Regions:
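N-terminal membrane-anchoring/stem segments of glycan-assembly enzymes
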Residues: 1-50, 340
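Short, well-formed alpha-helical segments that are part of the catalytic scaffolds
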Residues: 40-43, 65-78
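Cell-envelope/extracellular polymer assembly enzymes that use nucleotide-activated donors
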Residues: 54-57, 85
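Acidic donor-binding segment of Leloir-type glycosyltransferases
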Residues: 73-120
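Long helical/loop segments within the catalytic core of UDP-sugar-dependent glycosyltransferases
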Residues: 108-125, 129, 133, 159-230, ...
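Short beta-strand-to-loop acidic/aromatic patch adjacent to the donor-nucleotide binding site
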Residues: 139-150
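Catalytic donor/gating beta->alpha subdomain of glycosyltransferases that bind UDP-sugars
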Residues: 164, 170-195, 221-224, 228-293
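Membrane-embedded multi-pass helical conduit in multi-pass membrane proteins
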Residues: 300-385
């Protein structure tokens, strides 16, 4: 019967789709699922945590962000932690921010603030702000976050600190967005989650390659042993991802994914802000050491090939009225969609993300690599001086 017939081209397309589906399954089940596996282990008490709570310094770099400081700084200062200090390095206008920080210092004895000199040269202002904060820190353990970030709970520091074992020098945490309603926010929230599934997944697999400075801890001694940001001092960016890429190893890095240890950012208001952030990370990603970005690039490549293969299979088979072949091709798409939706949404639940991704998932699945290509093209055609220190 014609409906159950196969021709050679359709057989090749079905086989190619099946191989690409297997490749995708390996990525999702062996890499992207690791946050969920870690959460299950933590729930069963199968992970070893330190019982000590060493003193630590929280460092926040703010750039003309008095409203963000008003909104988020009290939640950081009121963490349930025995001994910690908060150091705010203010870059930009000093009037309102300076007044607010001085006012808070009268209420919180563990709050200190300083500023980036207007005359600073030869280093990016963000890296200088981080360096000033680290130099001012009294304690060895440093926790990095940003003024637009708010901890989900007062246990944030305790949960990070339970990973401060004798061998640990770097702890990677998760940062996401507060729930917003716009299309921009849905895209950014998915991108933030999927990016975390990649870099935290690799770290949990023993191959850390980057971190994000909104929820990141490392030792002050490690920073100075590595001579700070000297390896990429000429770049504006890299104070978080390039530094982690430089210092993080299998035996000195841990990951904290408890939902109470998550920090949240305000919903994005302008596409421009998100674009500039993504372009900034794209400009430094090409400098990462290790094979991780190539491995992830192959996942993206195999993903796009998979979609091309199953669509070609269904269309060609339908044109020939080979409905069995068309059904098999579509079933391979359905299988991957179900697997992908389960892994992504279970991970979102583990991280207390408010969004669940179902109907929009196929759109984001295609849109995400196209967006990444767009950021890379921006980097390619922009004036290279834009990425150098200012």
């Amino acid at each position: 019967m014609e409906a159950f017939a196969f021709d050679t081209t359709e057989q090749y397309l079905l086989a190619a789709t099946g191989i690409l589906l297997a490749v995708q399954a390996i990525y999702y089940l062996a890499l992207y699922n690791r946050i969920h596996l870690r959460s299950r282990k933590a729930g069963r008490d199968d992970l070893h945590f330190s019982q000590e709570l060493p003193p630590l310094s929280v460092i926040i770099c703010a750039h003309e962000e008095v409203e963000n400081l008003r909104r988020n700084l009290p939640a950081i200062l009121e963490q349930d932690y025995p001994q910690f200090e908060v150091i705010v390095i203010n870059d930009g206008e000093k009037g309102e921010s300076e007044d607010y920080l001085t006012q808070l210092e009268n209420r919180y004895s563990n709050l200190y603030h300083s500023f980036v000199p207007d005359s600073s040269r030869y280093i990016s202002r963000k890296k200088l702000a981080v360096t000033l904060g680290i130099r001012a820190a009294r304690y060895d353990w440093l926790v990095m976050t940003e003024a637009n970030c708010c901890p989900q709970s007062n246990q944030w520091l305790r949960l990070l600190a339970r990973n401060f074992t004798s061998r640990t020098e770097v702890v990677l945490g998760y940062s996401g967005y507060e729930r917003g309603r716009s299309w921009l926010h849905r895209r950014a929230a998915f991108d933030s989650l999927f990016t975390a599934m990649r870099y935290l997944g690799f770290a949990l697999a023993g191959s850390p390659y980057m971190g994000i400075g909104r929820n990141l801890a490392y030792r002050k001694s490690l920073f100075f042993d590595q001579k700070g940001f000297s390896a990429h001092l000429n770049l504006r960016r890299g104070d978080d991802d390039l530094f982690v890429n430089q210092v993080a190893r299998r035996d000195n890095t841990r990951v904290e994914t408890d939902p109470a240890a998550v920090v949240r950012m305000q919903p994005l208001l302008r596409t421009k802000d998100w674009r500039e952030e993504k372009i900034g990370y794209a400009s430094t990603a090409r400098l990462y050491h290790g094979a991780q970005r190539w491995i992830l690039g192959f996942e993206t490549f195999s993903r796009l090939l998979f979609h091309a293969a199953w669509i070609a299979t269904v269309v060609l088979a339908a044109l020939h009225t080979h409905w069995l072949v068309a059904a098999l091709g579509f079933l391979q798409f359905v299988f991957r969609f179900v697997m992908q939706a389960l892994v992504i949404n279970i991970t979102a639940k583990d991280l207390d993300e408010k969004y669940r991704h179902y109907l929009l998932l196929p759109i984001f699945d295609i849109l995400q690599p196209l967006q990444s290509l767009r950021w890379k093209l921006y980097c390619l055609f922009r004036d290279k001086r834009e990425f150098l220190r200012k």
